[in-house]
Curated annotation (Swiss-Prot):
Belongs to the baculoviridae p25 family. This is Occlusion-derived virus envelope protein E25. The keyword Phosphoprotein does not apply. InterPro entries: Baculo_ODV-E25. Its main location: virion. The gene is P25.
Length: 229
């Protein structure tokens, strides 16, 4: 009974805020750009005096990939674009040692997750006590607790190897793409490809890669098994 009464009071309160223009319902959708910038639940806009309700947007897929001769790689994939502050926060709080953390960068008011990267080079854009955050195009790479790997670039794709796992990042804005982009990948090595490029995603499926996350941005091939945790 008390639970129903509290719920009723909450609904009346929310209706009151909406009726008086104090509740910004647009902030409730995950498509709102502001969601990638903060995990705070409630904020008040000082200019509009609207109450903005924000949902946490730091969901990550964590998987263990078995490959090669008894190798197991720990991989974290950001499901949604993250700000640089969130990358550092999640990298310290949730990403374990000896792991790879990849995803897309998004800074509100600075750059869109779909905007072309400012440089074709791989750059270190943030250094922390535990790891460096490297960027390629609009994607980020964190290699935590593992030896640095040599990186090679060609045809809008960055590739490197981490503890026996071959990893490639494909530019989200690269077009057109052809099958020869992926034909150059090692034919038998366990390969993880990360991309938000829809044409590349289709080519990966056609070339026998397996989707391994909810956003269909991470693909695996030549693995023994993988397990999402």
């Amino acid at each position: 009974m008390w639970g129903a009464l509290i719920l009723l009071i909450l609904l009346v309160f929310l209706f009151y805020l909406w009726y008086n223009g104090k509740l910004n319902l647009n902030s409730l959708t995950e498509s709102s750009p502001s969601l990638a910038q903060s995990s705070d639940s409630v904020q008040v806009d000082p200019q509009t005096e609207q109450l903005n309700v924000k949902l946490g947007n730091n969901k990550m897929t964590y998987m263990r990939v078995a490959h090669g001769d008894n190798k197991v790689s720990q991989v974290y994939v950001a499901e949604k674009p993250m700000s640089m502050d969130d990358i550092e926060k999640q990298g310290n709080a949730r990403v374990g040692a000896n792991s790879l953390f990849i995803g897309t960068v998004y800074d509100q008011g600075v750059r869109s997750p779909n905007a072309p990267g400012a440089s074709n080079d791989v750059t270190v854009t943030r250094t922390t006590a535990n790891f460096d955050v490297k960027e390629y195009k609009n994607m980020f790479i964190v290699v935590k607790g593992l030896p640095p790997a040599k990186m090679t670039k060609e045809d809008n794709m960055l590739c490197f190897t981490v503890d026996g796992l071959h990893v490639c990042l494909v530019d989200a804005n690269a077009a057109p793409l052809s099958e020869r982009v992926f034909a150059r990948l090692p034919p038998s090595a366990c390969t993880l490809v990360y991309t938000r490029n829809s044409a590349a995603q289709q080519l990966l499926l056609e070339n026998g890669f397996t989707v391994v996350n909810a956003e269909h941005t991470a693909f695996l091939k030549n693995h023994k098994s993988y397990r999402e945790l």
